Amino acid sequence: MMLDGSALRITLDNFCGNEPVHLTRATVAVSDGADGILPETLVPLTFSGNAGVTIPAGERLQSDAAAFPVEKGTTIAVSLYFAEFTEMRSGVVITGPLSGGYFAVGDQTANAVLDTDTSKKTHTVYFLSDIDVLTAAENRTLICFGDSITAQAWPDYLMERTLQCGDGTTAVIRKAASGTRILRQYDNITYDSYGLKGETRFPREIQVAGADTVLIQHGINDIIHPVGTDVNRFRPWSDLPTAAEMIEGLRFYI
């Protein structure tokens, strides 16, 4: 966490889902710095007072606010359990020294340490879109928005630098989806995981509590993806934008 706070809530998003997602249980706790949590900090999260919730396709929702004191520099663990077969279409892959998680079989939301035989490390984050912290009014959020470049490590290093050298009033968060472009998106199963175009993503993803600045690193895939149908039938030269189209796409963000 990059800010001190007294309570938090999470946002779950089924943006790309084709069907409802049924969450059975969610918890939050302070991480032990490895593959477990500090059990005395474990707090169940609720949704309108209920342990579970259904997220309709294309929708998102927030948990109830939970009393959860945090200090700047603390690492927390949010655990989600889905008892039913779940379509995992809404998620992103992120890497970096501050990013990562675990995928596990069964309900391990209250486990102090994950069972090594039924869990594995992952860089894919499903459904968890935001973690809001109740903090001082003068604090703010900076959003790093982009594609695979931003899904990699540099936002984490910016977070570390901000924690070390900042004034303690700014949180840095990441909104990145690998393979995405500003102007176009793929309409085939081969590149379905490359996600939505910026025009679709941006208005939704910048709706973050306390955000007043967006740092954009986006557009390289618009340029490098088209290679001609003789090389890749899904990447025609007609997808290559003009300079004017790219400028107009970036102006949409502004």
Regions found by a protein language model. Give the residues of each.
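Conserved SGNH/GDSL esterase-like catalytic core that processes O-acyl groups on lipids
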Residues: P20, A26-A29, D35, I131, ...
